[in-house]
Amino acid sequence: KDNKIMEKVYTVKEVREQVKAWRREGLTVGLVPTMGYLHEGHASLIKKAVEQNDKVVVSVFLNPTQFGPTEDLEAYPRDFEADCKLCESIGAAMVFHPEPSEMYAPDFCTWVDMDVLSKTLCGKSRPIHFRGVCTVVSKLFNIVTPDRAYFGQKDAQQLAIIRRMVRDLNMDIEIVGCPIVREEDGLAKSSRNTYLNEEERKAALILSKAVFLGKKMVEDGETSAVAVKEAMIKKIESEPMAKIDYVEAVDGLSMQPVEEIKAPVLVAMAVYIGKTRLIDNFIVE
């Protein structure tokens, strides 16, 4: 691959022109949609994209429509310079970093919403979240028209929802899910980990401990969702700083609760450590 200097682009028009030029050369295009403050989890997505496509676009857009009124949009960490360095070092061809006004006109009123999948798990406590996700991802797909798009399995419900959206709306894009990347001690990498103080950071390990416990139970032959959930809940409750939002076992495609654990099943959780809401999961394939 030619190590041409990575482009930083701020408008839809510029992205379209560049992608059209690549298409004329017969090049394939991969998209990695992010909200910025990139970490090794994002890096693994970008690497995969660079392996599988001639050109890779990374979008860095802190999407306001997927945050509720009381959520952490204003506090969400940002470091665009560092994001660009990371993207360039891995071999991305372009970073697309639009202003909210470039993505949402003042009279914007069209939403991509989902009846079923977005109402469970994270959708219960974040009711408009997935509407914002689906809408912005649809827009990015229309702007970039990628051959493939890359998402992390840490946001497993988001991944399932995007796969369904692509199927239901006949979007000609291959969705590639990439495994969770963890810190050495097991904590799933997340931009929100930066909110944790030292004590909370230690307490946050209870999520991955519960995930590994549940995973081991399933590997050892446990098929009762209730048994796995109860063991995981008990584990999380042993950490006084942890407050459970949910621990659920759901069908990997429909996101509906299951009683029996047989593939494909997603076992997912959201847990507050202090004020910070963290998620983790494992997939039974």
Predicted features and spans:
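Nucleotidyltransferase catalytic core that binds NTPs
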Residues: 3-241, 250-252
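Phosphate/ribose-recognition catalytic cores of enzymes acting on nucleotide-derived substrates
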Residues: 231-285
